[in-house]
Amino acid sequence: MRYLVTLRVVSQPGGPPPADLMEAIAKLGQEAAETGALLDQSGLAPSSEGARIEVSGGRLTVTDGPFAEAKEMISYALYEVRTKEEAVEWASRFLKLHRDLWPGWEGEAEVLRLFGPGDFAPPA
């Protein structure tokens, strides 16, 4: 099963992430890739560089960022694992690195299962 993990920052100390955190993230990503669990990952640009498209009342509206949410989405990872618990474990390890190596950083991850065409096939 494929899972999308998104990371949102709630608050963080000023300045860039510590070098030891970035090194630990790279090692965790390498480990996940070597096991075949990690399919893709990347940081995300601030919402000020994005857009939101909405359909409401039959109208399509495009709004340029930034968006008012207090929690900025900053990265994602795409995993291929056997269970939701495995995806949660990878996401937890990622967040633990932030907790342990960047004092004062606060954030959250969402783990969402992806559907494919086979999930919508008619019953045999």
Model-derived regions, located:
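Conserved, structured core segments of small domains
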Residues: 1-124
